């Protein structure tokens, strides 16, 4: 994206979805000081409300000076500062379809040398630069547009309403209060009694708990928006493909009694309990000299690294043996994992070793016995059991800055513990406040802002 825009430019773009190609209405948005005049050049209207702010009126798009009309439109005018961008904004509501809306946009641009096509996210960027929204609200708008499920949309909308900023400002105000007390002591030390380190540490602990809760929620709501990738891992013929078919409610993978039937990765996207999940069926892991099967097994280990969650499946008929233990040792310790003992219908569960039962979900995939328990276990281990308590969506940028702030606060603990110079507390608190300010967009470079908004769609 180009460098930060100036209000000398007037920008235009299609603001409605056109990927399907057809629709009842398509919208062109125009923003800038020439927005109204540029639209007047291509619109003919007899409405008495024409070009008044916050009025909708009817008009016709004129292709040339011979009064050839190509579409009948509704025009909505929003004059500065009472618009999304804070500038003069005009919206042309055309008939839907790629052909007509592209033609209207082309006529608008060709008749106005001071109007150019908007860059991705440029309308939202102008709204941010003009103080109409903070950066978290702008990002939440983009998140809302790209929401993959209803719960993700709810979280994004809370950000649009300013809920992220409220939480960040609350933490920031706590730190500002601590900073004021410390800097007053540094500047006017003779006017203060001994500093109450215990009280300070208690206050900072409360702030850290707020940040840690936000960070923990950020990891959970990433699952809500992006989904949980779940790899089905195990030896051959333990029921991985059967479990994939059960969860998908249709036959996605071939199931036979022949070991090594699944030789490649099969992925299925599902939504379970309003949470998107990608179930990945992998080749059974075993010693083999068959080249194609070996490639599939290598891919299985690759999917272990890529996935958020591992379901390790073994056969209760065979029991959990040394070969299973060896495979599980290859799974990184930080991975979320649950162990599933399949084929419970073929054995007497009373004969299973009690230590084995402690960490195993018993299931008969063939008889659909245990599916609910498996799903509940996945949701619980991913921290999504109380998903209704997660009320904002935090992205990776927010998480990075929150983690940096938490690191600053941990450093203040070390300063006190090691009896380092008192003014170092002030430095760390200032850095922590600055990291929080970056979240809402108060401490960001132009280059970083450009990068953030370039990920938005063109009409937003």
Swiss-Prot record:
One of its GO terms (cellular component) is cytosol. It comes from the Bacteria. Residues 227-383 form the TrmE-type G domain. Mg(2+) binds at residues 241, 262. GO terms for biological process: tRNA methylation; tRNA wobble uridine modification. InterPro entries: G_TrmE, GTP-bd, GTP-bd_TrmE_N, GTPase_MnmE, MnmE_dom2, MnmE_helical, P-loop_NTPase, Small_GTP-bd. Its EC number is 3.6.-.-. K(+) binds at residues 237, 256, 258, 261. It is found in: Cytoplasm. Exhibits a very high intrinsic GTPase hydrolysis rate. Involved in the addition of a carboxymethylaminomethyl (cmnm) group at the wobble position (U34) of certain tRNAs, forming tRNA-cmnm(5)s(2)U34. This is tRNA modification GTPase MnmE. It comes from Prochlorococcus marinus (strain AS9601). The gene is mnmE.
